[in-house]
Amino acid sequence: MADQTSGQFKRNVAFKVRIGEIFLGKPFLENEKFLFLELGNRKIIRVNIIGNIVDKYDSQSEKRYFFLTLDDGSGQIKLKIFGDDVEKFSDIRQGQTVAVIGNLRHFNNEIYIS
């Protein structure tokens, strides 16, 4: 939903939400591709959340990736990090408090942040 009609890229708003609110919203998909999360009168694509890392999974395989579990007291959501971004986040540890701005995604009936 980023506006590219003027030739300039316009980033979507990163809404401040609680994790528990995300799971109350309704995901809209088109051909199994996530478009946005409807929460009240808002159409949410990007989120801004502060929480604690409660779990970390590092694949350590050829195609390295991380799964982090973020908890803000209202719920938990996975953060999935792939490709070149893996090295940027390799120092994150369980128990740390982090501010996350990322895009919501939907796969296999699961909403996560990337």
Give the predicted meaning of each segment.
Residues 1-114:
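OB-fold and OB-like single-stranded nucleic-acid-recognition modules
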